[in-house]
């Protein structure tokens, strides 16, 4: 089944501890930062929340690859009911992590332009961060019992995790099943193409803003345009990113077995992670934000701009060519 399913369990074990511990620590950190009215620490929490979500993306994908790695193996004492329950809680976790990341990024963008804290927005991030932390702990607790029958008790007993017919059918049920039916359910064949259209619109927004910002940093039209002028376009690109993350997760849930079997898929996700981190760099870089019309960016910032263009171009290339390159899936 290719590289990712075979290495999925190992990668998942390495990654999964980062969002679990990270969201707990960052939520507590943000609470005290708000109480002390410390803007510097609040910004640190916003950075952390966004980056933890970025890490959560390959964490969830490697978890799905792990499921396909163990689902049809008879040599492992794995309770599929627990696997599916774990997958459902993990999907809820990454949904709330995405909401936290969206608000955290907006808080950083707003702070860059206005220089103040975000009041109610901060408390909203704190509340969602607490929910995300709780869900992450639950997902981790369930996941830790999958390969350990000696600690399966109560709710975590496989017999109580999901109805037998779901486990036998290989259907995760719950929220995962809802998302699956949203894009593939019944005879509504228009749904997948409709979400594809949304995905293309989102990518157009992302790459359009990426080119405008990167070309300004590289030096195009620097005599007439300040960086602040293009900085205000970032929410448009971020809207495209939100659209693509939502539709992308629906595509993945709808056909995860095929996606994780595609050799080009890990390269797309790696490029996506890089692109999201570089996008954060352009959001919060004060040196770039201070550039006025006629001023040139530093050489290092220009290198970062090239990386930004290349990373999103890589995401687009592998996204389009996944079924055709390296033998498909």
Model-derived segments and spans:
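Polytopic transmembrane helical bundles with strong interfacial aromatic enrichment
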Residues: 1-329
């Amino acid at each position: 089944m290719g590289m990712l399913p075979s290495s999925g369990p190992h990668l998942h074990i390495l990654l999964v501890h980062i969002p679990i511990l990270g969201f707990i620590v960052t939520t507590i950190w943000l609470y005290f930062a708000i109480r002390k009215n410390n803007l510097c620490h609040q910004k640190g929490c916003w950075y952390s929340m966004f980056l933890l979500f970025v890490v959560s993306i390959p964490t969830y994908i490697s978890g799905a690859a792990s499921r396909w790695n163990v689902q049809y193996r008879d040599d492992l004492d794995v309770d599929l009911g627990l696997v599916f329950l774990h997958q459902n809680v993990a999907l809820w976790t990454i949904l709330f992590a995405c909401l936290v990341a969206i608000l955290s990024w907006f808080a950083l963008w707003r702070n860059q332009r206005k220089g103040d804290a975000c009041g109610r927005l901060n408390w909203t991030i704190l509340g969602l961060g607490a929910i995300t932390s709780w869900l992450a702990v639950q997902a981790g607790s369930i996941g830790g019992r999958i390969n350990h029958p000696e600690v399966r008790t109560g709710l975590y007993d496989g017999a109580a995790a999901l109805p037998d017919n779901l486990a036998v059918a290989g259907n995760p049920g719950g929220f995962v099943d809802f998302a699956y039916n949203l894009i593939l359910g019944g005879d509504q064949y228009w749904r997948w193409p409709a979400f594809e259209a949304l995905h293309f619109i989102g990518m157009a927004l992302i790459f359009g803003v990426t080119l405008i910002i990167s070309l300004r940093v590289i030096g195009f039209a620097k005599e007439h345009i300040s960086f602040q002028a293009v900085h205000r376009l970032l929410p448009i690109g971020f809207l495209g990113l939100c659209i693509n993350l939502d539709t992308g997760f629906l595509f993945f849930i709808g056909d995860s077995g095929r996606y994780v079997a595609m050799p080009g898929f890990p390269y797309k996700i790696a490029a996506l992670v890089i692109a999201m981190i570089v996008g954060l760099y352009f959001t919060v870089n004060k040196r770039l934000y201070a550039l006025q019309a006629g001023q040139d960016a530093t050489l290092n910032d220009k290198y970062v701009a090239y990386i930004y263009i290349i990373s999103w171009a890589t995401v687009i290339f592998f996204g389009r060519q996944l079924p055709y390159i390296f033998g498909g899936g």
